[in-house]
Amino acid sequence: MSNYAPFIKPYVEYNEHGWGPCEVPELDVPYQPFCKSDRLGKICDWTAMVPEKKFPSKYASTFGNNSQYAYFYEDDDSTFHLVDTTGSKATKPYQRGRYRTNMRNNVRTRGRTGRGTPNIASLGGSTAGGATASSTKYGKGRHTRNTQNVGRRFGRNAPTRIRESSVMVQSNWVSIEEIDFPRLLKLALPNIKEGKDIATCGSLEFYDKLYDRVNLRNEKPLQKMARVVHTVTTTDDPVIRRLSKTMGNVFATDEILSTIMCCTRSNYSWDVVVEKLGTKVFLDKRYNDQFDLLTVNETSVEPPMEEEGSINSAHSLAMEATLINHNFSQQVLRIGDQEQRFMFEEPNPFEEPGVDLASIGYRYRQWDLGNDVVLIARCKHNAVIQGPNGDMQFLSIKALNEWDSKVTNSVEWRQKLDTQRGAVLASELRNNACKLARWTVEAVLAGSDQLKLGYVSRMNPRDHLRHVILGTQQFKPQEFATQINLNMDNSWGVLRCLIDLVMKQPDGKYLIMKDPNKPMIRLYDVPENAFDSDRDEEEESSEPLSNSNDN
């Protein structure tokens, strides 16, 4: 026999109606609801923990206080009541990760809110440094300008401004192509040679070098020049009509080419009419169009608003900038019957009897863009100057205008122009990047030797009729293009891309339009009579660019 104790098989209960023992009486164990996300801070209720001052409910259950731990007084004292007259302060429940979203903004706030306490005022309560609950970022004494914009740092997530299209898209127009700016920025057409002159027209006056000495202590009032500038489109130019019969297959003006070549810098909507006749393409502008107006602060963070009747609206500023540019380009010349003029081979094609025309010289130039694409464009100069070696140098004269530095939040010219001209120019490059790029492209296309920029400001920010010249500055167009990061190879590539798209289409009329609210170029197929009404209105009320009586 073995010395081991005998093994007795235990009795196992079998529950036919459920799981678990069936003969053991119920012990009335209370059920306590629980949540797996609750923080375990105690193992039993024998002792009470010292609560934290900031988060007294840190270890509380998600389901609140359970009745099994509550103390009930057996005696009934229904006739005795205690009235609490002190106001109760609501405490927010503790939640893990509640302030994790603001950790990025509070990384470097040690010492700003007082004794290194993280800034949580934006979520309620007061900061340790004594700041009020409206403080959001820097604690002490800092209040937000608008309580509805809390969390929109640096203007992010701000509502975008809806711009109007330059032309209303009709239902019978057919969309052919949509090209976004990132695709256009990747284009390049290198090794485009200098344009070849095939015709020169008009006459130029000499630039007055006395305006190079103008500064803040010797400013000059801007005069109103009663001279006329004809802004003739491509198909109405008699010289282009004559040249199109024997040479070239793409025809345009320098304003139209610069608009297309600098389209990736534009924010406002614009459009160019394209007419395809066989193998020839004409790039035109619409009649009764705002195409010739200069934009103001187009690329700034806060461009001008469209306010009816305001002198600082976008349209009023565009009219003001256009007239300033016209007056400045004619005032800085040596005007007079006895003054010398530079004459081109042919007279001004837009000359009219009894009309004092502005000093403009037209150069019709030709470029070979490859793939049997020959471009002919009308370019222009504003003045001529005699170089150090006695040769004639052609100038493109433009004017930048200041209207209200406080509204635009830019550099004040009357304080910085003489001492920090680079800062002034950098501010203009930021606010008017598209306009300066267009001027540079026009000067490069025309073959100008110098690009003369004038700084013109209002005598009073509230007076848009009187201006003063504060200074001038000159650049070489090719060097200035490099300074403003203008890639001419990319500009030629954008132009060639749009020309190739039109060349693939059948004969007809098309429209190239910049989308008003998206960085995108759209190509539409439009009917032949799409803009005939605009042309009739233009012929009824057509006036060349000059100064009106109220300007």
Swiss-Prot record:
Composition-biased stretches (Low complexity): 115-136
Source organism superkingdom: Eukaryota
Keywords: Cytoplasm, Initiation factor, Protein biosynthesis, RNA-binding
GO molecular function: mRNA cap binding; translation initiation factor activity
InterPro entries the UniProt entry points to: eIF3d
One GO term (biological process): cap-dependent translational initiation
Location(s), subcellular: Cytoplasm
Function: mRNA cap-binding component of the eukaryotic translation initiation factor 3 (eIF-3) complex, which is involved in protein synthesis of a specialized repertoire of mRNAs and, together with other initiation factors, stimulates binding of mRNA and methionyl-tRNAi to the 40S ribosome. The eIF-3 complex specifically targets and initiates translation of a subset of mRNAs involved in cell proliferation. In the eIF-3 complex, eif3d specifically recognizes and binds the 7-methylguanosine cap of a subset of mRNAs.
Pfam families (UniProt xref): eIF-3_zeta
Keyword field contains RNA-binding: yes
Family membership: Belongs to the eIF-3 subunit D family.
Region of interest: Disordered: 108-152, 527-551
Protein name, entry field: Eukaryotic translation initiation factor 3 subunit D-2
GO cellular component entries: eukaryotic 43S preinitiation complex; eukaryotic 48S preinitiation complex; eukaryotic translation initiation factor 3 complex
Signal sequence segment: none
Subunit structure of this chain's protein: Component of the eukaryotic translation initiation factor 3 (eIF-3) complex. The eIF-3 complex interacts with pix.
Sequence segments annotated as region (RNA gate): 290-304
Domain commentary: The RNA gate region regulates mRNA cap recognition to prevent promiscuous mRNA-binding before assembly of eif3d into the full eukaryotic translation initiation factor 3 (eIF-3) complex.
